[in-house]
């Protein structure tokens, strides 16, 4: 549904990559529309995220720590939340930063949202801006949490 879309996948299992390529060809998708990227250093892995437009979270097992990396790099992510903890991790992260509109609860809405985002560069840019600004705030959050905890502990000790 998105003519110029390219899917970017991790290539770290030769047999899985072979099977994926077979399935891609079987479904009539040109192989040049799929990029298989090898594992790389963490800095390069994070730099690659600047080249993507949107991250498609997996289901039923969400991205977990990868989702955190994606959001910290300013890459918008679409997720499909389910009923289990592992299917709600990415949704929880998106909710915590005020991006509930990127959380879907069925396959049709997930696909439609991805297609809509692919056609709306301004909306994607707005999400990137929100994520980058929010990252600056999240960087300060641990120190604020520690100060709050210190205050609470001091008050508890003084109350003894």
Short names for language-model regions:
Residues 4-8, 35, 53-54, 76-77, ...:
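Beta-sheet entry/capping signal
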Residues 50-60:
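Acidic donor-binding loop of glycosyltransferase active sites
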Residues 1-4, 10-23, 35, 40, ...:
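C-terminal amphipathic helix plus adjacent low-complexity
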């Amino acid at each position: 549904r998105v003519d110029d879309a390219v899917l970017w996948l991790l290539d770290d299992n030769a047999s899985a990559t072979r099977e994926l390529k077979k399935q891609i060809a079987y479904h009539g998708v040109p192989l040049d529309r799929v990029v298989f990227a090898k594992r790389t250093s963490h800095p390069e892995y994070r730099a690659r995220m600047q080249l993507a437009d949107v991250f498609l979270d997996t289901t039923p097992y969400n991205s977990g720590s990868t989702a955190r990396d994606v959001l910290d790099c300013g890459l918008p992510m679409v997720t499909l939340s389910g009923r289990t903890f592992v299917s709600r991790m990415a949704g929880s992260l998106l909710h915590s930063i005020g991006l509930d509109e990127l959380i879907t609860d069925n396959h049709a809405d997930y696909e439609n949202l991805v297609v809509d985002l692919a056609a709306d560069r301004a909306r994607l840019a707005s999400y990137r801006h929100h994520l980058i600004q929010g990252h600056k705030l999240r960087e300060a959050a641990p120190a604020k949490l520690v100060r709050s905890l210190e205050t609470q502990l001091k008050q508890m000790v003084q109350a003894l």
